[in-house]
């Protein structure tokens, strides 16, 4: 299937679940990116999960963001239980604006959900010639050594930096081993 055809299908699914046009596009782009880079665990395989969370009112399909400005370089976003793609997209765009204006841009986000590959957002900043860091917490998924019960989240972290010899360098990792 061609990328454009797949995007239309994903877009329609999110629209059916009451996301606005712009947010449906943001989600579709992020999911397709995960598939293109081979991170299928963060692509189409998660689509049903997002839809189920919307149906269960765990994701607000029409969030109203609240922004608190701490300084010319630091913002805090209450994403109003937004789907993570939309909150992360907004946050990285704001961080880029702040960094271009003041030299550093920090945006904290609360009340959002799973946002897919953090490297996807890092890449946006690196393409603007900025060094970028992105990290989040996650629910318990890892058991301590010798234990049976999960206590630690995977807590993804990614970073990226412009590189003179290639377009960009990014790393996207988590605290867990690949299974």
Give, region by region, the residue ranges found by the protein language model.
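Generic N-terminal amphipathic, Lys/Arg-enriched alpha-helix
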Residues: 3-17
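N-terminal and secondary-structure boundary signal
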Residues: 15-18, 37-40
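Short, well-structured alpha-helical segments
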Residues: 21-32
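Intrinsic-disorder/low-complexity recognition with aromatic hotspots
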Residues: 41-45
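Active-site cofactor/substrate anionic-group-binding motifs, chiefly glycine-
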Residues: 46-91
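A generic, well-ordered mixed alpha/beta core segment in the N-terminal half of proteins
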Residues: 77-148, 155-162
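Expand to "…catalyze enediolate/carbanion chemistry for C-C bond making/breaking, isomerization
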Residues: 165
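Single conserved hydrophobic/aromatic residue that forms the stacking wall/gate
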Residues: 169-179
